[in-house]
Every structure is written in C-alpha cells, then in structure tokens.
Amino acid sequence: MKKLTTFTLPGFDKVAVYDVIKFLISEIQKDLIPTRARSISYSFFIAFFPGIIFLFTLLPYIPLQGLQESLISIINEVLPKNIVQNFIVFTIDDVLNKPRAGLLSFASLLTLFFSTQGVVSMIGSFNKSYAIYNKRNYFQMRWLSLKLTLILFVLFITSLVLLIVGNLIIGKMAILLHIQSSITIFLINTLRYLIILLLYFVSISLLYYYGPSAKKKFRFISVGSSLATFGSILASLIFTSYVSSLDNYNSIYGFFGSIIMFLSWMYVNAFVLLVGFELNASIYYNKNLKHQLEDEESDDYE
C-alpha cells in the first residue's frame, strides 16, 4: 500500500500518482470540470458558425482546384459522418450557393470576437483551478486572449495547409523525384501527420503555459498537455465510432440531432482539455504542499 501511495511517473515532479488521481477525482465530483467544459464548448460552438462562413467565403480567392472537396473530406475524417452530412455540409452549401456581399469581412470579425470570447472562458476556467480570480483586468484578459487566438489561428491554418496541400505536394514530389516506393510515400505521409500532431500539442501547451494568471508557470512541455493531445484524439475516435452507430437517432432528429451531437463532441474535447490542465494543476498543488510540509518539519526539527 505504501508503494502505491508513493509511486510516481516521469514529469510528475516526484508527486505520487495516487495524490494526482485523488485530486482529479475530487474536482470531477465537485462538478467543476463538467461545468467549465459546458461553458467552453458553448463559447466555441457560437464561434463555429462565423468561422465556417469565413473559411468557405475565402475559398474562391484561393487558386487551388478541388479545395472545397478536400476541405469537406478532411472535416469528414475528423467529425462523425452524420454531423458532417446534416450540419456542416448544409452550412457550407448555404454559404457557397448564396454568395453575400461583404460577408467575408463581417464573418472574420464575428469569428475573431467569438473565438476570443471562447479563449477568455477557457482562461477563466484555468484560473479557477489555481484558486485565482480576476488578477488580470478586463483589458489585459482581452489582449491576452486576442494574442492567443491569433497564434492558434496561425497554427490551425498551418495544419490545414499541411492536410490539404500535402497530398498535392507529395504527388508532385513523387513525379519529380521518381518516387515509386509505397513505403517512402507512407513515411512522408506519416511525417506530415506527426507535424500536425506536434502543432496541436504546441497549441494546447500555449494555452496551458500563458493562460493561467499565476506567477509561476507550468513547464511548457508538460504531462497535462501530452494527456490532452492524445486524450482528445482518442476521445474523438471513440465518440465518432459511437455516433456513427446511431443511425436511428440521426434519422429521427435530423439536423437538430446533428447540432446536439456536434455540441457533445465539443464538450468531450473541452472536458479532456480541462482534465489535462487539472493534471498539471494537481502536480503543481501537491508539489507545493510537499515542500511546505518539508519546510515545517525542518523548522520543527530546529
């Protein structure tokens, strides 16, 4: 039993895994993580609509053939099929088939505003894990959220370019360099997805590192960001598999059912993101507590 309560892992700063899990369970039981996840998912859900409008209104200005089909194909790989067919594609078709003057600038402003609001909501959730409330004033919070939003947008566009243009580049490289080996092409594709995974990891690490208004920061490369990266991918795969089996649910509720499923998918990812942050917060909390107890023991000894 003693070994169980003292066992630790790399990246835990010698904090026992038992103490970390105990802290996480207590936070979930208090309903703090689920409540914050609902708030974050709702904020980003509102930002999704103008984001889609902005992205697909921008497509005609990009001189690449088959760009729309490639983008829909990528969305289809990430999100459950039922959501894509009844919800995403419906929105995309409406944007492309009914062009509206001035929509690009309006959609970009709305996307920026609501995305920034989502980051504000996320930072607020992070601060509650530290028991820190509103240490930054309104303008400081907005400015930080805007900077993080713009950085995340650049990382997102980079990932999107790698996904969409990657196949085209690989095809041309294969022709120019006379690459015929399927293993070589597979390795190049694997490298491309590893870079995208790295960009996703960096995005989460940026939020964990710069988001909380704490004097002492987490490590940029942390256990929590690793858990959130792989956890969200695994959760999305499980959720996609589960939703794909609910054909009756989709046929009954149709478009509104797709909205509910999309919100649920965003909630699951927000929940995993907060669990990753709570893991870092638990290590931080228990490490400080351990140091305090050691200091008190040394004072008593003296």
Task: Identify the meaning behind each predicted range.
Residues 2-302:
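Membrane-embedded alpha-helices and immediately adjacent juxtamembrane helical segments
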